[in-house]
């Protein structure tokens, strides 16, 4: 049947990370090319203690630009107080001006000799030479004062030329509700 006076309603389903990108709250970034120089490397997505947001990790990549395989160990609940903050981070919605600034930071250290002493090693991977390991799914939420650390070169020889670690995440404000005494 045809109803000329009725409007057709439409519903469009989009992935939640795309929704966050549309709002200007999805960020992506990477470390520069990191060289171990007979040391191990730490790369991390860090949520500063005063951020007032949760970071929802959507993607982690480890790109091994080397002739040798590389080990990557992933830690939660570990602290990284030191490190260089990467400036290669951007909001993924290029239409928002001024560009939103993320609370989360990508940090890295190239002079470590052992894995994080605190925290939990949640999984490990081998990254083949001249390849990229991609981990996606959005199951990790980093609250203020926490981080996700990638420790490189832990259980394979410390001979790798270049590696790049990248993170994709969105940020959601933590709302504090006043206590209700009803």
Residue locations for each model-derived region?
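Beta-strand-centric surfaces of beta-sandwich/beta-rich domains
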Residues: 1-182
């Amino acid at each position: 049947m045809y109803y000329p006076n009725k409007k057709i309603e439409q519903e469009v389903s989009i992935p939640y990370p795309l929704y966050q990108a549309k709002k200007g709250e999805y960020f992506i970034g990477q470390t520069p090319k990191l060289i171990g120089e007979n040391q191990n490397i730490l790369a991390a997505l860090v949520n500063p203690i005063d951020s007032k947001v949760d970071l929802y990790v959507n993607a982690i990549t480890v790109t091994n630009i080397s002739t040798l395989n590389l080990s990557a160990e992933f830690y939660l609940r570990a602290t990284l107080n030191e490190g260089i903050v990467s400036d290669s981070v951007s909001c993924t919605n290029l239409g928002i001006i001024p560009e939103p600034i993320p609370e989360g930071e990508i940090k890295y250290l190239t002079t470590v000799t052992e894995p994080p002493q605190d925290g939990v090693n949640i999984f490990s991977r081998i990254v083949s030479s001249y390849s990229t390991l991609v981990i996606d799914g959005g199951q990790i939420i980093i609250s203020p004062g926490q981080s996700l650390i990638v420790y490189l070169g832990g259980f394979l020889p410390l001979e790798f030329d270049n590696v790049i670690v990248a993170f994709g995440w969105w940020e959601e404000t933590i709302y504090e509700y006043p206590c209700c005494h009803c």
